[in-house]
Curated annotation (Swiss-Prot):
Organism for this UniProt entry: Vibrio cholerae serotype O1 (strain ATCC 39315 / El Tor Inaba N16961)
Keywords for this protein: Enterotoxin, Host cell membrane, Host membrane, Membrane, Secreted, Toxin, Transmembrane, Transmembrane helix, Virulence
Any Pfam family hit: DUF2523
Stated role: Increases short-circuit current in rabbit ileal tissue mounted in Ussing chambers, by increasing the potential difference. Cultures of V.cholerae containing the cloned ace gene cause fluid secretion in ligated rabbit ileal loops.
Chief place where the protein resides: secreted
Entry's localization field: Secreted; Host cell membrane
Transmembrane segments: 76-96
Gene Ontology cellular-component annotations: extracellular region; host cell plasma membrane; membrane
Domain of life: Bacteria
Lineage, top ranks: Bacteria, Pseudomonadati, Pseudomonadota, Gammaproteobacteria, Vibrionales
A GO MF term: toxin activity
Name of the protein in question: Accessory cholera enterotoxin
Amino acid sequence: MLMMDTLYDWLIDGFTWLVIKLGIMWIESKIFVIQFFWEMSQKVIDMFTIYPLIQQAIDMLPPQYSGFLFFLGLDQALAIVLQALMTRFALRALNL
């Protein structure tokens, strides 16, 4: 009976270890894919020079408004939101 308990405990520990390792691998792979597409969307934004276009659009506003928006960092916030939307589009296009 003692041998069966030891074998049972060994199997339980082995399956527990396997499930934990598979879960960690799954999470790491998801993080890798998200980082890859985040960097890819950043390259696309740089390639099409979208960030300077956002700055130019804000510069076209009256100085009191554009200064306030730059102070709040709205240009950077719009760039981050745009990059997040592009990342989401790429992930959905590949069903990830």
